[in-house]
Amino acid sequence: MKIKTISGAERLSLKRSIDAGTEEQRKTVRSIIEDVKANGDQAVRSYTAKFDCIEIDSPLVTKEEFEEAYTSLDSRLLQVIRQAIENIREYHERQLQSSWFYHRKDGTMLGQKVTALDSAGVYVPGGTAAYPSSVLMNVIPALVAGVERIVLVTPPGKDGLLSPGVLVAAAELGIKDIYKMGGAQAIAALAYGTETIEPVDKITGPGNIYVALAKREVFGDVDIDMIAGPSEIVVLADETAIPSEIAADLLSQAEHDKLSSCVFVTDSMALAETVSAEVNKQLETLPRREIAEASVRDYGCIYVAETMVEAIETVNTLAPEHLEIITQSPEALLGSIKHAGAIFLGRYSPEPVGDYFAGPNHVLPTNGTARFSSPLNVTDFQKKSSIISYSQSAFEEHAESIAAFARLEGLEAHARSIEARERRISK
């Protein structure tokens, strides 16, 4: 794993560019979306056959498939899923916002009305892999928010079936509307509807570049959570950290994808050299060695700063999806961290704890967007309406000022809207 010393000037070049896809990929996605809008289920079936190599006549998961999923899933794993649900729900319930109102002395009442979205569509990656954790992390905040209709889509395997873990996770949350479809065609079906699926108000969940581009295309007609890029981890550590643990944590993200980013930031060259050697050692025995090696080679790096203050500045420049702080006193550094999707404090809080079990959401901003965005949360499934109720006395007191403001902007009809009421009051 390559090692670099880092200075203030060099930090400016660290930001990773966002993969917006090629023009050919964007054209393909637009074509798929238009086809689904025009031809509905027929188009979805056609693309499922083309891309997933399976003919699916009826994409809706049946009651029998749910029953088979429960039968085939190990009882221990069922308990793990249920415990994770409890943890995730407990955390997200603390995010729930309520409507509020207040009154001024002149009789004015102002407020904010909080309302859950009517519907949401969740995309869960599938095909060759299974991600029941994605079901939990996307569905639970929507349920806590009060979303009434939640639809889930996920690509089928080559046998036309879905992962038992995914089905059981959904069933444990009361989600029955699950459709075997993936890719840009599934995003289009959620956004615009087909004969089988009613359109939804918001689409969440990660996917490949075609899913990401499709979400970008439909945004505005529906809401989306974010455009997720490859997974990222930054580990910030001092000489008190254990090198083998740091290496294991870096590789936990490197094995996700050849495009995943794994970065170690420290103020100790000795630790940097030991961790680099440990990464190479652990790579040799990884089942997903080819993927992890490509990630480490192309997007992995160890940055050595002169001081911990400079190391923290490097972290804030990177604005990573996941940040682990493994130092003598990680809590003391927390206040200096400005930009990170999720922050894991101490050696007993490695990133997989948050991926699956702790409670906070694992749908996190990537590609440096933690500078201005947040993890998926309950408020993403709520919307707010401003409430304004002026009393007659308040209106009379401020009417002249409001009309003057309208004319300042050259909007005469606005001013007359105010004055029409003034005249009626004065009669």
Swiss-Prot record:
Catalytic machinery residues: E321, H322
A biological process term (GO) from this entry: L-histidine biosynthetic process
Keyword Calcium among record annotations: no
Binding-site residues for NAD(+), renumbered to this chain: Y123, Q185, N208
Keyword terms: Amino-acid biosynthesis, Histidine biosynthesis, Metal-binding, NAD, Oxidoreductase, Zinc
One Gene Ontology MF term: NAD binding
Binding site for substrate: S231, Q253, H256, H322, D355, E409, H414
Superkingdom of source: Bacteria
EC number(s) on file: 1.1.1.23
Reaction(s) this enzyme catalyzes, per UniProt: L-histidinol + 2 NAD(+) + H2O = L-histidine + 2 NADH + 3 H(+)
Keyword Nucleotidyltransferase annotated: no
Cofactors (names): Zn(2+)
Pathway connected to this protein: Amino-acid biosynthesis; L-histidine biosynthesis; L-histidine from 5-phospho-alpha-D-ribose 1-diphosphate: step 9/9
One term under GO cellular component: cytosol
Residues involved in Zn(2+) binding: Q253, H256, D355, H414
CC cofactor note: Binds 1 zinc ion per subunit.
Purpose of the protein: Catalyzes the sequential NAD-dependent oxidations of L-histidinol to L-histidinaldehyde and then to L-histidine.
Family membership: Belongs to the histidinol dehydrogenase family.
Name of the protein in its database record: Histidinol dehydrogenase
Highest classification ranks of the organism: Bacteria, Bacillati, Bacillota, Bacilli, Bacillales
Gene: hisD
